[in-house]
Amino acid sequence: MNKLQLIDADTLYYKPLAHPKMLIDGVLSDGLAILAGDSKIGKSWMVLWLCLQISRGEAVWGLPTRKTDVVYLALEDREWRVQQRMQELTDSPPENLRFGFSCGQLGAELEGQIEETLREFPTTGLIFLDTLQMVRDNASAKVNAYAQDYKDLSGLKKLADDHGICIFVVHHTRKERDSSNNEHGICVALRHPIPPYLPIRKGRAPVTPLKGCDIYADSNRGNQCAGL
């Protein structure tokens, strides 16, 4: 049996620790992030725009960004569709933004593929995974959706934390909602342990609520922010 690794309060209080590196000031840091919303409402457009802005170090929602290499795994799209979107969004594609259109499954090849990518492109600081459903074991998810959501994203979070990067997961929310207007499944299962969480809903006010441990952006800047 492995012994619990404990640290006393005084040691922790004075221990020099690195703070999370922000990619979008006050909104997005390294670790795991989730963009959740109904299908066909423009999540992939938003992700591509974020890729372009952050890879060039340009502002997002009026907030400063940290320039870094970006990988976008656009698993639900083909090359021509992403090309078309990019041509509408920019005239100068950044060289430090890279795309992938297929990858292995979670718990099988994906983690190794991400680590190999980080070895090949060590300045990568952000990886978008669009969408979670394309890389997970759907058979296992049907057995216990809550537990599978937690397992899948906890593994990705550890991978992001170990390498000091941000893995940004795009997820289609389910149509059913609970009594507090939250989508069932991943949003409920991971609201607390996996920051930050950005839900986007169809047919409602154009607001993107942000929730996460490291989010401190002023809500007057156009986002609803709450630290957990």
Predicted regions and their residues:
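Post-Walker A helix-loop "phosphate-sensing" segment adjacent to the P-loop in P-loop NTPases
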Residues: 53-67
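Phosphate-binding/switch region of NTP-binding enzymes
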Residues: 19, 34-35, 40, 44-45, ...
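Conserved inter-motif catalytic segment of the P-loop NTP-binding fold
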Residues: 2-4, 10, 18-19, 24, ...
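Short, polar/flexible loop-turn hinges at active-site or ligand-entry regions and domain interfaces
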Residues: 61, 124, 204-206
